[in-house]
UniProtKB/Swiss-Prot annotation:
Superkingdom per UniProt: Eukaryota
Keywords from the named record: Secreted, Signal
Expression across tissues: Expressed specifically by cells of the ciliated left-right organizer.
Name of the molecule in the record: Ciliated left-right organizer protein containing ZP-N domains homolog
Amino acid sequence: MKNQHNTFWVLCLLFVMFDETFSAFPFGNGRIQFDPIRENSSDNIECFLDYMELWVPRKQINGLVLWLSQIMRFPVSLSSLDRSNQQLSRCKYFLDADADGNFLFRVHYTGCYVQTQEGFYKLEIHMVKKTSSGRGQSNRYLMRCPAMTAQLGREKLRCDPNYVQVSRPIPLGNSNDQADWFFSLRGELVVSIEDASLIGVEVDVSNSSVTVSGLRGQLLDGIKILDRQIDNLHLWLAHGFYAYSLEASCPSVSQHPGEEVILHIPKQRVGLVKRGSYSADILTLKNLIVGQSANVTVTVTENKQFVVINIPSHEVLQRQDCYTTIGNNPGVQFFYCIDLVLEFTEMAYPINWTLENYYECSVRVPQMIQPKPTTAETFHKIKLELHTTPRSETRTALVITPTQDNTLASTSVTLAAKLRESVHSAIVQESSKTEMSASGYDAELDHVASGEYFNRIEGSGYYAETNISAALRLRKCHHL
């Protein structure tokens, strides 16, 4: 009886060993064995406003590379990451190595195969592993991040002749840990929030917003962008490995703008970014909304760092009474307040941007300027579809200026109640080419190397206004 009992357990053990051994080898030539899907450890994934990032140990990177090569239909190579990332960018993927030889896999929420389910962005990835028999085995992982509100995509900028003020929402939604944050001015001067006055920055922090201000002469640096002199604020709020942009640009100080109002908007992501990573980011303008009175004509120019918008002065300029600094004489001060919403191809959320700019008080009113009375605010939206074909050299300015001639190197864009049914040709100066048409938001996914199309699943997220304290509200312009 004892021998029969031992024989039973031996047979059970052999059966288990047989089952475990052969379950690892799928039947059928070239077939891949899939393990049950599992969520990746929260220690390995980080969620940002526009994208999620997966940390991949170097011992597992070959499995990810094999999977990417299969779905992209071209060989992804770790030895030529720049070339591979050019192809991966078509699906809004990015692969980068860290100092320890491990890798970061970045996926934008609007990338290929990203799905939205129950308030989360999800992407199923496969770590493919080749077995000794040549067959593939795959571990399935689920990258998952919550959809966030777009409150970080708001910026209010006020430029006065003597000082500048920038307001943005708190990047983490509260100010409880503000002691751990510090400012970086011009990439060199680093101080804590409490010591910001040492670099000429006044800080006002609420539960939802941070407002910085200071004298223009201490904070702003004169730079030249597309043959135009501007004053630039290069200020970042940093915390550990992350940074949050407070960059802004003001027009140079003068008594009047001339025939055109020119806005310089730094290209920047709306949420936290890895420190140092923002310098390699390239953002492409996709859509523009102008919150002004009817028939506002806009000329758009962009390069790698800035979006530049030209508006005729008489369409936005206002005036108010003032007293001159010298002599305290009564005069006239010109100003404008402009609301813009900018949408970039590489970002899941728009940027809501407001600029108030005040010129110096002038005793004499220039006759060339006739401010146009503003009426009730009406939004006019142009839907742009831009395709950029970068050349081998660094991408520089895309110049778009009004013209009726197809032989000239530009295209005119008019924001009005009714958009033109078509726009003319556009060629881009220097190192890139852009085609623009009023044809809606979404473009089909570009061809990959094989010439095939991928199914693109948009990570739509959601966009909502936020409740911000009245004292620091990022208000829109008040048009009289």
